[in-house]
């Protein structure tokens, strides 16, 4: 794999119209990941590689092909070839859900919405893991555009994420209903591109790949958030290509949020893997459908990892609040948990989801689930 090969792909992007196929992108990214492994010095060779990689990624962004479904999917598959994936047997049916087998979920957003809201997807994952029959295996990273990413929050809560990797996940898997996998410990290829992404300072195809890189194949339902309406349908199709057996909600809050929004409407693109052909069903959500009041995003802001962890553990998971208190962060978490629950059950009884979320919190199950994971990691 050579710089000349990468240059040939760049020239395909510069043709009018662009001639780069989705398969070409897959192969080009394999070349890039291979080349960047060599860039550990300030040598002339490294400078040459950085220049050619930057040229390719910039040209790709200008063509907007990196926001097309087939291209996003092939890019994700290329990165996964440089990842440490987890090989797991499926849990026995009676371990989690005696009637239908385990429901294993993830909830994660692309980021990039610029809203800097509370760590709601991580919080909702923890609360949902306290609901009988659900197992949440959340995959995420640390903050890039906000002040507290999922990894920052989990680390501040006391989990030694350095111990959670492809070798230890199988040990943690049987006895935990909540798990968190920090992306950099599984995707070494993404580590190689981090310098070039910072150097470029513009969004690239790598900015949208995170939710499509889950290292555990047994996740069978997921909520993936996107930051723009235009990206959402393409992202839904990409998710169907990367996760063909997964039922998926792609969510976009109309205020520009990659979560189910606490104010205004949220559009959901629904991928049903049991359908004979890929037809995206869309529907809308708003807080009133959950029996909740609306809350301004400023009332659901992130305060940084330390304060977010305190609020989550000492206020939300401790049972300080109840439905009807109209606490913005509490309601925000309830709402996103309810959507996870309803996805797991295959229905849209959002108010039932709220009830299940509250039961998880006030029974202490959610907090126990979090603490059990932290203790399990510590004992590795």
Swiss-Prot record:
Cofactor(s) the protein needs: Mg(2+)
Keyword terms of this UniProt record: Amino-acid biosynthesis, Aromatic amino acid biosynthesis, Glycosyltransferase, Transferase, Tryptophan biosynthesis
Pathway: Amino-acid biosynthesis; L-tryptophan biosynthesis; L-tryptophan from chorismate: step 2/5
Cellular component terms (Gene Ontology): cytoplasm; cytosol; nucleus
Binding site for Mg(2+): 258-259
Biological processes, Gene Ontology terms: L-tryptophan biosynthetic process
InterPro entries xrefs: Anthranilate_Pribosyl_Tfrase (IPR005940), Glycosyl_Trfase_fam3 (IPR000312), Nuc_phospho_transferase (IPR035902)
Pfam families per record: Glycos_transf_3
Amino-acid positions noted as binding 5-phospho-alpha-D-ribose 1-diphosphate in the UniProt annotation, renumbered to this chain: 109, 119, 121-122, 142, 144, 146
Molecular function terms from GO: anthranilate phosphoribosyltransferase activity
Chemical reaction(s) catalysed: N-(5-phospho-beta-D-ribosyl)anthranilate + diphosphate = 5-phospho-alpha-D-ribose 1-diphosphate + anthranilate
Annotated EC: 2.4.2.18
PANTHER family, alphabetized: ANTHRANILATE PHOSPHORIBOSYLTRANSFERASE (PTHR43285:SF2)
Quaternary context: Homodimer.
Other notes: Present with 1760 molecules/cell in log phase SD medium.
Family assignment from sequence similarity: Belongs to the anthranilate phosphoribosyltransferase family.
Function comment: Catalyzes the transfer of the phosphoribosyl group of 5-phosphorylribose-1-pyrophosphate (PRPP) to anthranilate to yield N-(5'-phosphoribosyl)-anthranilate (PRA), the second step in tryptophan biosynthesis.
Protein name (record): Anthranilate phosphoribosyltransferase
Organism of this sequence: Saccharomyces cerevisiae (strain ATCC 204508 / S288c) (Baker's yeast)
Lineage of producing organism: Eukaryota, Fungi, Dikarya, Ascomycota, Saccharomycotina
């Amino acid at each position: 794999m050579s710089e000349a090969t990468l240059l040939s792909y760049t020239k395909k992007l510069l043709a009018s119209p662009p001639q780069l196929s989705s398969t070409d992108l897959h192969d080009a990214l394999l070349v890039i990941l291979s080349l960047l492994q060599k860039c550990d010095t300030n040598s002339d060779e490294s400078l040459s590689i950085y220049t050619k990689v930057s040229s390719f990624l910039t040209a790709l962004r200008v063509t907007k092909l990196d926001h097309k479904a087939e291209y996003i999917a092939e890019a994700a598959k290329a990165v996964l070839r440089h990842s440490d994936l987890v090989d797991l047997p499926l849990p026995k049916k009676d371990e989690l859900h005696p009637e239908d087998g385990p429901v294993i979920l993830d909830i994660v957003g692309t980021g990039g919405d610029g809203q800097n809201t509370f760590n709601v997807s991580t919080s909702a994952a923890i609360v949902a893991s306290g609901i009988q029959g659900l197992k949440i295996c959340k995959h995420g990273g640390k903050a890039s555009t906000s002040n507290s990413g999922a990894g920052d929050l989990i680390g501040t809560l006391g989990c030694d994420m350095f111990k959670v990797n492809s070798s230890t996940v199988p040990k943690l898997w049987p006895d935990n209903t909540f798990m968190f996998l920090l992306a950099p410990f599984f995707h070494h290829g993404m580590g190689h591109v981090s310098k070039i992404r910072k150097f470029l300072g513009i969004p690239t195809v790598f900015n949208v790949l995170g939710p499509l890189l889950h290292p555990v194949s047994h996740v069978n339902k997921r909520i993936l958030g996107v930051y723009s309406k235009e990206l959402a349908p393409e992202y839904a199709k990409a998710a169907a290509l990367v996760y063909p057996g997964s039922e998926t909600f792609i969510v976009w809050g109309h205020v520009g949020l990659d979560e189910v929004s606490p104010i205004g409407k949220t559009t959901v693109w629904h991928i049903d893997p049991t359908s004979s052909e890929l037809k995206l069903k869309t529907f809308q959500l708003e807080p009133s459908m959950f029996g909740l009041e609306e809350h301004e995003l400023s009332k659901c802001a992130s305060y940084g990892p330390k304060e977010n962890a305190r609020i989550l553990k000492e206020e939300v998971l401790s049972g300080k609040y109840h439905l009807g208190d109209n606490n913005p962060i509490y309601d925000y978490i309830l709402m996103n948990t309810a959507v996870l629950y309803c996805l797991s059950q295959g229905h849209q009884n959002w108010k039932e989801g709220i009830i299940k979320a509250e039961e998880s919190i006030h029974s202490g199950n959610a907090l126990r689930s979090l603490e059990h994971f932290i203790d399990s990691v510590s004992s590795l």
